[in-house]
Amino acid sequence: MIYELRIYHCAPGRLPDLNKRFETITLKLWERFGIRPVGFWTVMIGESNHDLYYMLEWKDLAERESLFGAFATDPEWLKARAETEQNGPLTTSISNTMLSPTSYSKMQ
């Protein structure tokens, strides 16, 4: 397994809107595509309370490219994204890191 850590750096005041989109739209679409989230986090103490962190689990990079690529071009997703960003983008930038577990990690 590999893990993808994504950090969405939200525009000021837009984190609640991003959380709502994940909860009501994105997760349902991911389930349809077979995308497996490990967890979601917001910053309690740290540099930015405007960030959403989440992690996805993949069998390999090929699965990631196939499933996330299909999701990213899905007409239902594109419509929902446009509708939820009518008042401007929810994020200012997105950080993305692919992680490989160490031999001593509980998550393999």
Predicted features and spans:
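Glycine-rich beta-strand-turn "strand-cap" elements at beta-sheet edges
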Residues: 33-50, 78-108
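Short amphipathic alpha-helical segments
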Residues: 14-40, 72
